[in-house]
């Protein structure tokens, strides 16, 4: 079952809940944290299952916060579906081709942490003149392009799913809050599909005593994500995405220090 302890499970769940919906790359943070804790995530099947469990906890937070709104808003569901289609197509056709080439490549992670941060700085300035205050006003062709951004994020580690979708929303004319909210909502079909399948496939391999650690990490991620999603909307309304962009660029340097020496 690896060497993960209860406090490590709690810490990892909190970090996932904090970073999954911020444009800072949750994968980059978790990879760095696993390294600092000395946990061999690439070699331990249980740790891979644990990662899936905490991601599921984080995405459930969005469903709890937006479930009622989604149930009554078909126009919003249409846009989620339109954006999800190119994401699925890109993932289906291209992910298997590059999986063994760049996934797990630390230089690629460091580069995209920095690159997306730099582009996010530019896009955040565009948001000051945003044309659309609600994703339902965004033309469907532009909505589909946000899905393309999300699909590309799955191909290039360090990009960040939320970072890519927020960046796409800003570049395509959404204001900051609308871009952030649509990023949250677009995570629902994308992550539930991927995470649910992975968890179902790996559940029989969970050893005795492992379920309590999975539950601890799941609940920690859920609780933290509930707070983070609410906080982020208020934060970007006041400060924009510039602080996140600068943070990404600094994190790229830290990541390179630990993994590229």
Curated annotation (Swiss-Prot):
Does the record's keyword annotation contain Membrane? Answer: yes
Localization, per the record, is: Cell inner membrane
Q: What range does the record give for the signal peptide?
A: none
Membrane-spanning parts = 9-31, 46-66, 80-100, 102-122, 137-157, 180-200, 209-229, 240-260
| A GO cellular component annotation in the UniProt record | plasma membrane
From the UniProt record, list the reaction(s) this protein catalyses. Answer: di-trans,octa-cis-undecaprenyl diphosphate + H2O = di-trans,octa-cis-undecaprenyl phosphate + phosphate + H(+)
Keywords annotated in UniProt = Antibiotic resistance, Cell inner membrane, Cell membrane, Cell shape, Cell wall biogenesis/degradation, Hydrolase, Membrane, Peptidoglycan synthesis, Transmembrane, Transmembrane helix
InterPro entries the record matches: UppP (IPR003824)
Q: Which GO terms describe its biological process?
A: cell wall organization; peptidoglycan biosynthetic process; regulation of cell shape; response to antibiotic
Q: Give, as one word, the top-level EC class.
A: hydrolase
The EC number(s) attached to this protein equal: 3.6.1.27
Q: Which Pfam families match?
A: BacA
List the membrane topology term(s): Multi-pass membrane protein
GO molecular function list: undecaprenyl-diphosphatase activity
Is S-adenosyl-L-methionine tagged as a keyword? no
Instruction: Output the HAMAP family linked to this UniProt entry.
Output: Undec_diphosphatase
Q: Give the protein family.
A: Belongs to the UppP family.
Q: Record's PANTHER family?
A: UNDECAPRENYL-DIPHOSPHATASE
Task: State any further remark.
Answer: Bacitracin is thought to be involved in the inhibition of peptidoglycan synthesis by sequestering undecaprenyl diphosphate, thereby reducing the pool of lipid carrier available.
Task: Please describe what this protein does.
Answer: Catalyzes the dephosphorylation of undecaprenyl diphosphate (UPP). Confers resistance to bacitracin.
- Name assigned to this protein: Undecaprenyl-diphosphatase
What is the protein's species of origin? Thermus thermophilus (strain ATCC BAA-163 / DSM 7039 / HB27)
Tell me what gene encodes this: uppP
């Amino acid at each position: 079952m690896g060497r993960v302890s209860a406090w490590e499970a709690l810490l990892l769940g909190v970090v996932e809940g904090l970073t999954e919906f911020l444009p800072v790359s949750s994968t980059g943070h978790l990879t760095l944290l696993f390294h600092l804790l000395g946990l061999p995530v690439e070699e331990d099947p249980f740790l891979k299952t644990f990662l899936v469990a905490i991601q599921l906890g984080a995405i459930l937070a969005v469903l709890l916060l937006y479930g009622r709104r989604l149930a009554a808003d078909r126009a919003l569901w249409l846009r989620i579906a339109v954006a999800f289609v190119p994401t699925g197509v890109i993932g289906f056709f291209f992910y298997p081709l590059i999986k063994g080439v760049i996934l797990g490549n630390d230089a690629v992670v460091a580069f995209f942490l920095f690159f997306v941060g730099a582009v996010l700085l530019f896009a955040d300035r565009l948001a000051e003149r945003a044309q659309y205050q609600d994703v339902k006003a965004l033309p469907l062709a532009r909505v589909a392009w946000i899905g393309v951004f999300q699909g590309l994020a799955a191909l290039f580690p360090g990009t960040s799913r939320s970072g890519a979708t927020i960046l796409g929303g800003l570049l395509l004319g959404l204001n900051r809050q609308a871009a952030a909210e649509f990023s949250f909502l677009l995570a629902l079909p994308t992550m539930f599909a991927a995470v649910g399948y992975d968890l179902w496939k790996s559940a029989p391999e969970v050893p005795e005593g492992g379920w309590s650690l999975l539950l601890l990490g799941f609940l920690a991620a859920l609780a933290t994500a509930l707070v983070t999603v609410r906080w982020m909307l208020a934060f970007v309304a006041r400060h924009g995405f510039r602080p996140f962009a600068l943070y990404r660029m600094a994190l790229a340097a830290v990541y390179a220090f630990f993994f590229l020496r």
